[in-house]
Amino acid sequence: MVTIEVNNATSKLIGYLHQDPAVNAQLHEAVRQELSYEVPSAEWSQKYKQGQWDGRISLYNKRITTFPSGLVRRVRQLFEKLEIEHQIVDIREKPERNYPITCDFEGKDLRFYQENAATLAKKTQRGMLSLCTGAGKTMTSCKIFENLAVAPVVFIVPAIELLKQTQKEFQRYLRFNGEKIEVGIAGGGLCKLNMEGINVITYQTALIAFDKKYLEKGNKVVDDPNGDGPKSTAQLQKELEEANKNLIIANNNATRDLSKLSLDLENANMLSDKETDLKKKKTLASAALNLEKQFNKEKNTLIKTDLAAYKKALTAWDNRQETLLQKSQVRNLISSCNAFIVDEAHVASVVIEELGKQAKNAYYRLGLSGTPWRMDNQEIRIEGTLGRKIIEVSASDLIELGFLVPPKIFVCNVSENNGGETYPDIYSNNIVNNWERNYRIKQFAEGFKEAGRPTLILVERREHGDILEGMIEDAVFVPGGDKGVDDPTDEEKNYRRRMLNAVENNEIVLIATQWANVGVDAPKIATLILPGSNQSSVTTYQQVGRVLRCVGPNIEVSKQNNKPDAIIIDFMLEQKNLKSHCNMR
């Protein structure tokens, strides 16, 4: 009989799957296949063409017979299917309920599915909660915290825009002994953790703490030797020691060069001290003071360059020590947390996988997402870290229940069809610089604004936003990313919020880039125009979710607030690639 030994992060097969070595090897291969996924476009790989690779990546390590614990259910079902005798031994330590917090939703009642989600989270201990935009993930998360009652908790968010917003909402609803709690935060230059409570951390900050970084282009996590900065800590220490040495030498040289002035100052002080006549004493003291000022001025001039170099080196060293301290605090928090929860868990599966490995002590592992699937087949990585989907609440469910407004989706055909030798040329000619398409966007945007419908336009390229801003009356283009590579400053975040308020008041037509795809709280926006040509169903669901929120608790109140529905405008072109993208959306 084989034993499945379950731990928080990884599980292990102990014993033989079969006494016959050949059959045993075949069964291990079956486990490898069961815990694998097909790599898109693998058929173009040389190893695949040469028969050296089957085009799949497995999460099962055959050499040491381990796999992510979120996949135990798959292994158990496989063993039952193959009639392999097995037992499950759970060696995890369940944490004590050491953080009895409560929720104060300010008179609001949780919806039934939010209660169910929070109950299932505690019961299953790990899993994905598929809650669409508008389902109330923040309040659901707070109820989960109350049900689990453990600390510390790490709550991962994918972008800097969500960091303070999430912290603020948690502090708004959570109570300890009747008082509002202090929620820890790390990211965007902030690091104020609560080792005995709940903490919100960006995944970029969490990765940096372990000297890792995420490469979006290759969709992988790699070591980051320069995570602390372009210079190593040893190099900064050497520079500080050298600067200190040079400053000492400069001080000695200045003292030597100013020896005569120093002697004059010493004599002047001596004469002043000995003088008994008050009037003469005052005159001598004034002369001594002037000599002291002259001495200090000339000395500062002589050591100015070396002093500045020392201060610069000391500041760099102090900053590095602060960075190392903060990284250590984040590492300790993640390594010791009792609950590891990821918001927007679909964003980067390899990041979740890496951080899940580091959260070795996390008994509870949960993910929240409105779109818990990926275009690259890597959902199994998310499942391995966080577990299978335990509840699903779709936009259709909430529309039927009256918690979201119904969408009206229109696809506008564009007859202008321009060629191009490469895809960037095709995109530029048919999307960015397509006069017919852009003019129709202008007509739609201005018409909806005039009709009193706050309108959002989501572009994929900055140059496209610039063009549309110049064409559309009252349009304001607010560019920016969403991956945390170039985190917005507080001023930029405040500007975005002001522009969101302006579009909600129908003062402007807002044109935005991917920063507005997720985490934007602007329920009054009633119209969405999609001028780009993305082919990701995940992105499309996120974008459409921006305009489905009710203005108020339900559709009836939303109708009273002049938002009975949401209108989404998309475009269809006859160019082969772009037409395919539209069909996928």
Regions found by a protein language model. Name each.
Residues 422-460, 467:
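Conserved interdomain hinge at the start of the Helicase C-terminal
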Residues 516-555, 574:
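Conserved RecA-like helicase motor core of SF1/SF2 enzymes
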Residues 147-172, 462:
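Conserved Walker A/P-loop ATP-binding site and its immediately adjacent core
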Residues 391-405, 549, 553-585:
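A conserved SF2-helicase RecA2
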Residues 476-514:
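Conserved helicase ATPase core of P-loop NTP-dependent helicases/translocases
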